[in-house]
Amino acid sequence: MKKIESTQELEKAVKDDWSVFMFSADWCPDCRFVEPFLPELEANFPEFTYYYVDRDKFIDTCAEWEIYGIPSFVVFNEGKEVNRFVSKDRKTKEEIEQFLTDSLAKA
């Protein structure tokens, strides 16, 4: 997973093919919960490029994109939002897998 460091990087990544943005924060226990199985998800869904977005560093983007809970996931394809899994609830591996499968089905 690539870490987004600037607004310019984020804007460029949004325009790529099949980008998954994970909004997270170091202090978030539910975000830490998903970390152990993220590499497996990345391997099982190679169609996507995965990006980590620090909620605290990109607080304005979170407001603009209506990211009000973390961890949250947003999928873009060629500059268009395809799907989102945004809530304050803890996400399971199975829920994220279903989200990624559903995102690809919207192609």
UniProtKB/Swiss-Prot annotation:
Induction: Up-regulated in response to depletion of tryptophan, phenylalanine, tyrosine, or availability of charged tRNATrp. InterPro entries: Thioredoxin-like_sf, Thioredoxin_domain, Thioredoxin_H-type-like. Residues 1-105 form the Thioredoxin domain. CDD domains: TRX_family (cd02947). Disulfide bonds join 28-31. Pfam families: Thioredoxin (PF00085). The keyword Amino-acid biosynthesis does not apply. Keywords: Disulfide bond, Redox-active center. PANTHER family: THIOREDOXIN, THIOREDOXIN-1-RELATED. This is Thioredoxin-like protein YtpP. It comes from Bacillus subtilis (strain 168). The lineage of its organism: Bacteria, Bacillati, Bacillota, Bacilli, Bacillales. The gene is ytpP.
